Each structure stands twice: as structure tokens, then as C-alpha cells.
Amino acid sequence: MPEKKNKPELLAPAGNFEKLEIAIHYGADAVYLAGKDFSLRNFSGNFTDSELATAIRIAHAAHVKVYLACNIYSRNHEQLQLKDYLEKVGRLRPDAIIISDPGIILLASEIIPHIDIHLSTQANTTNFNTVRFWQKLNITRVNLARELSLNEIKTIVENTEMETEAFIHGAMCISYSGRCLLSNFLTHRDSNRGLCSHPCRWKYAVVEELRPNEFHPVEEDSRGTYMFNSKDLCMIDHIPELVDAGISSLKIEGRMKGINYLASVVKTYRNAIDAYAADSETYAVKEEWRKELFQVFHRAYCTGFYFGNSEEQSPNYGNSHQGKIHSFIGKILKCYGENRYLVEIRNKINIRDRVEILSPTGPALESDIVDLSTPDQTPVENAQPNTQAIIGLAHSFFPNDIIRKIDSKQPVTDS
């Protein structure tokens, strides 16, 4: 029976190699990723078979576990292809495979019995008897339904011998754990086949059939409204409750999010979990953690269903995106002498710009760009997107640290 109140695993998304490196750099204990087929995030980049092998080697070398998503609901014509794919998974040897379809669970149990099976949140697990049922089918972990309260999760943990996993940060679906047909209806993209176009995030208005050119906002608000637009989940203020509930793994949503978002969120929850594990008696949420999460690209935050607050669960009726105005500059590729760094530039930067650098530990540090040059060390006044540049900073940093420009007039970016 698993320990109920041990330090939980921090599980982060890894939609491609760059995101994998960032998740590892900022402290994830495990990552979830996918191949090119049979995943619910076909637009996140994902990995070819050979890339999966490399990704697993990279993660395992850093003592980070890898969970491979195979969480679509499959059709008859895919069964032979699924068998071939599962045989490949067996050779790749991820730490677990994430599945929702009982038919794929059956195949995986037969073809790759040496690989742990984690049940996807798409399976809508909401009570301890359901967990017991899945355990009899060789499931080793259940990603619980997002619709559960913290007290309900505690009851499940106390009445089962299964590892549990729960989302703690990121986008939430307006439908029951992703069972939605809006995307199918409006764009002919199947949300349960990895092709969701997120129409719940679109801006809608009411049109009266005899006045086709008159658009009326659903709420009396000059900005209109987002009829289905869920707030984002954020549980940074409730790490003690999550840990004390005995949840085995705390999961961050976002395989399609950029590395600026990923670095910020993984770092923040890593720091919070470690702080609570080190001294639960004097633990307190740091304002710098809240600040970090509030300055990345996000919708209004809430605690979802964890505390049963209907207002918290309500749609986001304001702007779809919030966050501090800053520009993501790029990431450090390597050190280039004392306090000089080769940087992959994502947004324009000028010499003497004020920037902040996010490292895995401690708060973000500010610095001026004290010198700027091309990779062949030719001095320049600015560096353009999709180039590399050598920049001089006032402090010591490391490869994969994230750089952001302060007080930019550009909107928050996340790529």
C-alpha cells in the first residue's frame, strides 16, 4: 500500500524536446509526453518513435520518469496498428503508459505486461470502488477526475491501495473530464481523438434570427463574454492540503504551452513542494510564487472543484488572457565566458534593455543587457527573433535559464 502523505511527485508536460529539457531543468520528477499517434494532444509537437527513445534516455539520465500518453478512444480500424504501437512501447520502456480506453488497457496488459498502466483522467474516475475495479485490471495509478473535491480525493486515498494523480495547475475543460463534442460540431475536429480546436475559448454573442447583423453580448459588458470559457486552475495556495490528502502525483496541464509558461509553473510548484516537505510547521506561501504564476499567460485563476465553491468553478467572464506585460526573450544555450551567454532569441532585444532571468532556485534576478553581440562576437545594438546572440549580464546563470524583458509594451508571450 503506498504511503499516503509522502512528498508527492511533480509531473510536468513535455510536448517536444525543448519542453522536455525545460521541465527537467526546473525540477519535474516526471514528465508526460506522447508519440505521433494515439494521444489527445496531436497539436503539441510530440515525438517520433526514434525521438521517443532519445527522450526517454534523456529523462532517465536525469532521474526523471517518463509516462507515455496513449489516451484516445480507439476505433475498430486501429486495432492492428495499436498492437504494433504497443509492441514498440514495450521496447522503448517508458515508466508507464497513460490509457483511458478499456480496450487499449486490455491490449497493453497482454502485449506489454512489464509496463505500468496509468488510467487517464478521461476515464472519469470519481469514487474508490471504481479505483478498486481498475486495480483488478492491473492499473497502477489513477489520474482522478477533475470534478472531485479535495475531501472526495482524501476518501479515495484512504479507501484504496492505488497511486493517485491530480491536476493542480492549468486549463480546465468545460465538459466532464474532456468529454466534449463542441470541436467536432463546429470545426469537425474530434476532441477525443487529439484534435480539439478549443471552441470553448472563443468569444460568442447572441444573434436574433430576424436581425442577422446585430450582435448582442450574453452579459452586459462592453467586452462581450466567453460563454464557455473556464478559468484556469491554480493551487499554489493549497500545497499543504494537496500533500496531506495523500495524492501521489501533482500534475501540471500544458503540453501545448510554451517554455516560458512551463519554466515558470514547474519552478514555482517545485519550490513550494520542496519548502513544505522541508518544514511543514513553518511553511507559508511566498509572494514571489504567486507573482511568478500571475505574470505568465493565463486566464483568471480558480481552485476548480477542490473546495466546492460554485463561484470558483464559474466561467471566466472577463478577458480571456491575463498576465504581467513582459516579453519572453529566449533561453540561455551555453555560457560564453564570465557572465556572457549564448542565447536563442525569440523576441527582439536591445543593448541596455532591462531583463529578468528565471533560474530553477531563488527569485527571478534582474539585470541590464551590458553588452550584445552576434555569435561571432561582432557588437550589435539589437538582436532579432529567431537568431542567436551573445549577451552580457550582471550575474551567473545556466543553460536553459529563461530570459524575459521587463516593462515591455508587448503583450505577454509564451513560446
Task: Give a label for each model feature.
Residues 103-104:
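Alpha-helix capping/helix-boundary segments
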Residues 44-53:
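Aromatic- and glycine-enriched glycan-recognition loops and surfaces
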Residues 80, 114-115, 119-128:
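Gly/Gly-Pro- and Ser/Thr-rich, intrinsically disordered tail segments characteristic of DNA damage-repair
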Residues 24-27, 107-111:
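Alpha-helix C-terminal capping segments
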Residues 1-26, 30-40, 55-56, 62-72, ...:
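Surface-exposed amphipathic alpha-helical tracts and adjacent flexible/coil segments at the periphery
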